[in-house]
């Protein structure tokens, strides 16, 4: 697929790109290369190929779900102004 200068200009306007007349040929060549690659990919027969999310079937390595932090509630509540039964007491702000 080969693009014309008008088509390249239209694509540039739609993409809000400022392309000078001297740059159109270089941009057209790059776009032609991209569209050529797309045509090659579309020509591949994928009938019977099952869709996949990743190219390789690998399991995600996860760490063991173990507690890594000790319970420090008493240390945190020791510096609080008021606590009761493991809860923080705060002044009433809504009447």
UniProtKB/Swiss-Prot annotation:
Alphabetical UniProt keywords: ATP-binding, Ligase, Nucleotide-binding, Protein biosynthesis
EC main group: ligase
GO biological process, one term: regulation of translational fidelity
E.C. numbers: 6.3.5.-
Reactions catalysed, as given in the entry: L-glutamyl-tRNA(Gln) + L-glutamine + ATP + H2O = L-glutaminyl-tRNA(Gln) + L-glutamate + ADP + phosphate + H(+); L-aspartyl-tRNA(Asn) + L-glutamine + ATP + H2O = L-asparaginyl-tRNA(Asn) + L-glutamate + ADP + phosphate + 2 H(+)
Keyword Protein transport attached: no
InterPro entries cross-referenced by the UniProt entry: Asp/Glu-ADT_sf_sub_c, GatC
Quaternary structure, from the entry: Heterotrimer of A, B and C subunits.
Alphabetical list of HAMAP family matching this protein: GatC
PANTHER family per record: GLUTAMYL-TRNA(GLN) AMIDOTRANSFERASE SUBUNIT C, MITOCHONDRIAL
Protein name as it appears in the record: Aspartyl/glutamyl-tRNA(Asn/Gln) amidotransferase subunit C
Organism of derivation: Azoarcus sp. (strain BH72)
Gene name linked to the record: gatC
């Amino acid at each position: 697929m080969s693009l014309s200068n008008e088509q390249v200009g239209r694509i540039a306007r739609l993409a809000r790109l400022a392309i000078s007349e001297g740059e159109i040929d270089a941009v057209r060549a790059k776009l032609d290369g991209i569209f050529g690659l797309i045509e090659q990919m579309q020509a591949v027969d994928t009938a019977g190929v099952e869709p996949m999310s990743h190219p390789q079937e690998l399991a995600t390595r996860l760490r063991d779900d173990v507690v890594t932090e000790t319970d420090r509630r008493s240390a945190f509540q020791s510096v609080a102004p008021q606590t009761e039964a493991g809860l923080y007491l705060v002044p009433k702000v809504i009447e």
